[in-house]
């Protein structure tokens, strides 16, 4: 396999030849090193203590009942699994994936709601500016009846608006921030990220 643009860098070796053996040995060593690092990382994560969120309360039930659509069984399962993970005293390690339109945003918003109603802050990272804007507007609509402040960090915001959001994250007056990779910038500081 070669990636696009790698055509000039491809070198073929004879199977069983010395070049092949050297390449194979290097790849094996690199793979073993990567596996060792992953095992060490997961061991550290298992020993790390995180914040254990309390069980769902009436606010959570009210928020979830206000969803305008009927949840799919998979949505309900995913939301329950994620909230269960949040109630454990160690960092969560979970990836939620699915096709467009299957309800991932609602599952994420339920977790975000649980997070902020317990006094923590939440960051929602989106891969594109348009998706960040959509998530921001969906969150505003879904949470308009609750005491939650939501900010957006993306190129759609003026410098002044971004400064206000950054200040709110640092002092705790912004509960949820939605954004692109901008959220990973060094100037983004949270008061108490959950």
Predicted regions and their residues:
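Conserved hydrophobic/aromatic pocket- or pore-lining residues that grip, position, or stack substrates
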Residues: 75, 100, 128, 178
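Conserved glycine(s) of the Walker
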Residues: 103
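Conserved motor-coupling elements within RecA-like helicase/translocase cores
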Residues: 153-177, 184-193
